[in-house]
Amino acid sequence: MSGTTEQQVSAQTPDWSRERIGKFWDPGQKLMRALRRYQAARARGGVLGKAASKYWALNHLFWSTICQSEIHLNTQIGGGLRLTHPTGIIIHPDARIGVNCMIFHQVTLAGPVVLGGHVDIGAGAKLLGPLTVGDHAVIGANAVVTRDVPPGATVAGIPARIIKP
């Protein structure tokens, strides 16, 4: 999807350059920046941290509205998350996202979904938890995943079935 192979993208070490804002209008990256800075300010604590967290919460609300996406401020997200076409993405507050994942538009992570490292989720996919997706897995577009996905597998369909182990 991004022109790199599975072996070139780590499932353990975050590639922070994937979250870098590359152009003026990059709403997905700006949404992630607001979320990351909110979490950092919240962790800092104190009066300054509280004021900064309020600013970044408003910034997150602005970019969530622009993207029409719902990503809770306290969701655990590993480094290097790429939101390609970030419209209509809904992520449950109990979901955990591993490093270097890529999520396309209209994706829903419902319930306590755990994504491993370098998981690519195609447009319109629905992951209905509780479930776990292994490292380097690929979820096809419009798939409805209701069961665990093993590492390195490709799943697609409604309901999702393994098409490449």
PLM region spans:
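Terminal amphipathic alpha-helical/low-complexity segments used for targeting or macromolecular assembly
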Residues: M1-Q68
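Left-handed beta-helix
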Residues: L73, G78-G79, T84-P93, G98-V99, ...
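Conserved switch/coupling elements of ABC/ABC-like ATPase nucleotide-binding domains
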Residues: A160-I162
